UniProtKB/Swiss-Prot annotation:
Alphabetic keyword roster: Bacterial flagellum, Cell membrane, Membrane, Transmembrane, Transmembrane helix
Any Gene Ontology CC annotation: plasma membrane
Main location group: membrane
Top-level taxon of origin: Bacteria
Protein name per the record: Flagellar biosynthetic protein FliQ
Gene Ontology annotations of biological process type: bacterial-type flagellum assembly; protein secretion
Subcellular location per the Swiss-Prot or TrEMBL entry: Cell membrane; Bacterial flagellum basal body
Family the entry assigns: Belongs to the FliQ/MopD/SpaQ family.
Pfam (any one): Bac_export_3
Species annotation: Borreliella burgdorferi (strain ATCC 35210 / DSM 4680 / CIP 102532 / B31)
Residues annotated as transmembrane: 17-37, 50-70
Function of the molecule: Role in flagellar biosynthesis.
Topological relation to the membrane, as annotated: Multi-pass membrane protein
Amino acid sequence: MTAGHILYLIRISIENIIILSAPMLIIALIVGLLISIFQAITSIQDQTLSFIPKIIVILLVIVIFGPWILNKLMQFTYMIFSQLQNV
């Protein structure tokens, strides 16, 4: 296993982390922004108001994107284990 091969595996791993976490992070960002705008408009200063909607929305995103995330993780795991033959 060469240094180039290890760097390739690290790059692929980081790409997968970014791609698989992006739906949850983007949706949480949008929900947080909308709740912040709502709080600014209504002058509500409760810091805990944004947590429950974010948790609910992230759970919904996990339910919706869960099969896709699981499929990508299985493909990545299969690729990593197939690379072990080259060691």
